[in-house]
Amino acid sequence: QMDQQVQNDLVEKITHRYPEDRIFAEENGLRSPISEGSVWVIDPIDGTNNFVTQKEDFAVMVAYFEDGIGQFGLIYDVMRDHLFYGGGEFPVYRNEVELTPFVDQPLENLLIASNVGMLEKNDWGMADLGMDSLGIRVYGSAGISFSKILSGGILAYFSYIWPWDYAAA
């Protein structure tokens, strides 16, 4: 399975360079506590269904934590060749371009992203919130959704997700 191979490659490179660091990752139950020591959080292919069916709108996500505090993250939109990186004390970039912070605007001028399940059930008022916004987008990948937030294309992403889905954001 491609997810497992990508994760194995990332884990091998990280542990070779940082042998004392630990891993928290989606595949194979690698679950070192994020709150203890130096921990890398990995989602090898976020948006696996998109990867398999469309060959687009998927991302590789890696984050680094020290004693439970995120130091930086990387989100790689593979098919667009966009690498988002930074966070914590570092500015945020897309490839070589520093991204500008969000500028507050009325909700009716902004797009939001969600997963289909939250919209269908109106969980937490998602469908209602969508009616008050410019519109809702469903990308099928937390990494792609977060990259849209970082680029200023959407305001927020709402979903039921795991730590490896949001750690890099």
List the predicted regions and their residue ranges.
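A structural micro-motif at secondary-structure boundaries
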Residues: R94-E98
